[in-house]
Amino acid sequence: MNVIVDPKKLIKGATGDWEVVIGLEIHAQVTSNAKLFSGAATAFGGAPNEHVSLVDAAMPGMLPVINAECVAQAIRTGLGLKAQINLKSTFDRKNYFYPDLPQGYQISQYKQPIVGEGVVIVDIGDGESIEVGIERLHLEQDAGKSLHDQHPTMSFVDLNRSGVALMEIVSKPDMRSADEAKAYVTKLRTILRYLGTCDGDMEKGNLRADVNVSVRHPGEPFGTRCEIKNVNSIRFIGQAIDYEARRQIGILEDGGTIDQETRLYDPNKGETRSMRSKEEAHDYRYFPDPDLLPLEFTAGYVEELKAKLPELPDEKRARFIADFGLTPYDAGVLVSERESADFYEAVLAKLADGTRDGKQAANWVINELFGRLNKEGVAIDASPVSADQLAAIVDLIGEGTISGKIGKDLFEIVWTKGGDPKALVESLGLKQVTDLGAIEKMVDDIVAANPDKVAQARAKPQLIGWFVGQVMKLSGGKVNPQAVNDLLKSKLGI
């Protein structure tokens, strides 16, 4: 069988090239004030067992009642993933014993999930993208948390998370490198944040990944996969995949076989280790939950939710490229977080009609603002420079009141001290020199003082940039560099 495989994604081995095959199961905590089947709060950081109802604690006689908002959030997510929405789905009991699972089973969806197949378009750099298929999305309860470090001889259980709604988003095994897997999780998290269905906070455990990894020679059937459980950072996902792929290749090249098992990733050692043999579905003895009726809703309800969806990153990126002439890269940077895209659009909305330049605004948001935010470790919603202030700076440059260099100085002043950019230009005397006579005198002075450079510039016209720089320096950045450039060309006969 002839199979075309990108050689950059292959791993060199003693017995030839190997291809890694990756599928991900993402557990995303649903953004909701209450849990999936109870009215207990979902707030993070409460005292142990503060947010626990009788349902969450599995007290006898307590019956689950579905949270309609969690259902709506799952449908919104399915729509955002361009997936099939199933108008009828059912809940099942997944039976296993663990101390932080008080019911002795987890309420999940097995045979009939709420969302079927979908797709995510993932940018992987250099203008390339891949399609990652979505197998399904289903709703389920989260478990509690066992605490083993509170007492030398006892373990404790915190049920605050017990019963919190999760969306398990199962991908198809369509990824072929750690970088692709990381890009997929990043894109999926962005979509969830745009939709407002999950905050994607991996540090709080609100987004976790089970990573399925297998290896094969290109063109061969899929190998035996191992599942790496509960990886809680995008960086660790990449590290776990790289280690696990090489571990499996080493075993196979030594003549061994891969055991289908569940493994854990240890970020301190940078390795995976065996946790238990991988269970099959029959090990969990799934059966329909007798306490919950099938979940049914109408196509009209789905359309109602669809009509209220926000513009998603792919559509927003395409609009930025088409309407504002942005490069695909710049548009991608701006839409990578909803807050970033909103800030950019707020800047555009404040620009004067005559100077509305989408590219110029994007350059200032990406290079100056994002660069400074990253350097200082400040979130965009806490930016010292507001969208109104940045728009004013871009306007001042666009209308020729200040130069680009002075614009950067003005940005620094606003960042550190605040203030109205237009008022600061007046009070600090930052206006651009527009008197052609004054500009011509500066040009003449620089030309007269550097006859050797004049000869060089006539031989190599690109050296005119040196003269422009000297005039800018002499003026304190207050002249228009294009006007200086044109004047120099005339003076030097270039």
From Swiss-Prot:
Gene Ontology molecular function: asparaginyl-tRNA synthase (glutamine-hydrolyzing) activity; ATP binding; glutaminyl-tRNA synthase (glutamine-hydrolyzing) activity
Family matches, as InterPro entries: Asn/Gln-tRNA_amidoTrfase_suB/E (IPR017959), Asn/Gln-tRNA_Trfase_suB/E_cat (IPR006075), Asn/Gln_amidotransferase (IPR018027), Asn/Gln_tRNA_amidoTrase-B-like (IPR003789), GatB (IPR004413), GatB_C_1 (IPR042114), GatB_Yqey_C_2 (IPR023168), Gln-tRNA_amidoTrfase_suB_CS (IPR017958)
UniProt keyword list: ATP-binding, Ligase, Nucleotide-binding, Protein biosynthesis
Signal peptide start and end residues: none
Keyword Repeat: no
Any GO BP annotation: glutaminyl-tRNAGln biosynthesis via transamidation
Disulfide-bond pairs as recorded: none
Enzyme Commission number(s) of this protein: 6.3.5.-
Keyword check for Metal-binding: no
Reactions catalysed, as given in the entry: L-glutamyl-tRNA(Gln) + L-glutamine + ATP + H2O = L-glutaminyl-tRNA(Gln) + L-glutamate + ADP + phosphate + H(+); L-aspartyl-tRNA(Asn) + L-glutamine + ATP + H2O = L-asparaginyl-tRNA(Asn) + L-glutamate + ADP + phosphate + 2 H(+)
PANTHER family recorded: GLUTAMYL-TRNA GLN AMIDOTRANSFERASE SUBUNIT B MITOCHONDRIAL AND PROKARYOTIC PET112-RELATED, GLUTAMYL-TRNA(GLN) AMIDOTRANSFERASE SUBUNIT B, MITOCHONDRIAL
Record note on quaternary structure: Heterotrimer of A, B and C subunits.
Family stated for the protein in its record: Belongs to the GatB/GatE family. GatB subfamily.
Record function comment: Allows the formation of correctly charged Asn-tRNA(Asn) or Gln-tRNA(Gln) through the transamidation of misacylated Asp-tRNA(Asn) or Glu-tRNA(Gln) in organisms which lack either or both of asparaginyl-tRNA or glutaminyl-tRNA synthetases. The reaction takes place in the presence of glutamine and ATP through an activated phospho-Asp-tRNA(Asn) or phospho-Glu-tRNA(Gln).
Protein's UniProt name: Aspartyl/glutamyl-tRNA(Asn/Gln) amidotransferase subunit B
Organism: Afipia carboxidovorans (strain ATCC 49405 / DSM 1227 / KCTC 32145 / OM5) (Oligotropha carboxidovorans)
